[in-house]
């Protein structure tokens, strides 16, 4: 189990690594980082630093979910089990997508949560974490980026 101080140091290191890439890489190199790379290099270690055991039954990576609105099957990148039937999804995107302007990503993440009747879902590219409501607000293709939006956190380390 990761202690609070160890977790803080791991998160700080991840943010410093990410910020280093952000400042040093050209636009072309930045775009070469795909969703799988973000999960492997940043998100998996980040969630581990928060105390989630990524190889346990409490976390499923690429969790298959049937969408309630059209019956299609998609894969949320993460399913976190809090116990007692409480779960949430996290959907990863490649970095530099500007999640605050891409409503299609928010709608996708919300569909996973809505279909599973989860209260919230997280959309992230590691640079930003956006929290959306899932339960009770059916996602529609024409929804705006802030529909069902709860909060955003930017990945900047402050002690």
Q: Language model features by range: what are they?
A:
Residues 1-120, 128-158:
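A short, conserved, highly charged catalytic patch centered on acidic carboxylates
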Residues 125:
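Short, small/polar-rich loop/turn modules that mediate ligand/substrate recognition or access, typified
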């Amino acid at each position: 189990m990761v202690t609070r101080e160890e977790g803080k140091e791991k998160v700080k290191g991840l943010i410093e690594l990410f910020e280093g890439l952000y400042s040093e890489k050209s636009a072309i190199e930045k775009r070469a980082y795909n969703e799988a790379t973000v999960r492997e290099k940043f998100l998996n270690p980040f969630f581990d630093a928060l105390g989630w055991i990524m190889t346990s039954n409490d976390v499923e990576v690429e969790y298959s979910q049937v969408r309630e609105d059209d019956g299609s099957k998609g894969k949320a990148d993460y399913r976190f089990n809090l116990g007692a039937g409480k779960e949430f999804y996290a959907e990863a995107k490649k970095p530099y997508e500007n999640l605050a302007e891409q409503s299609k990503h928010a709608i996708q993440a919300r569909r996973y949560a809505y279909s599973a009747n989860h209260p919230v879902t997280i959309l992230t590219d590691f640079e930003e974490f956006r929290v959306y409501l899932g339960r009770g607000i059916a996602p529609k293709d024409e929804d705006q980026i802030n529909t069902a939006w709860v909060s955003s956190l930017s990945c900047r380390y402050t002690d």
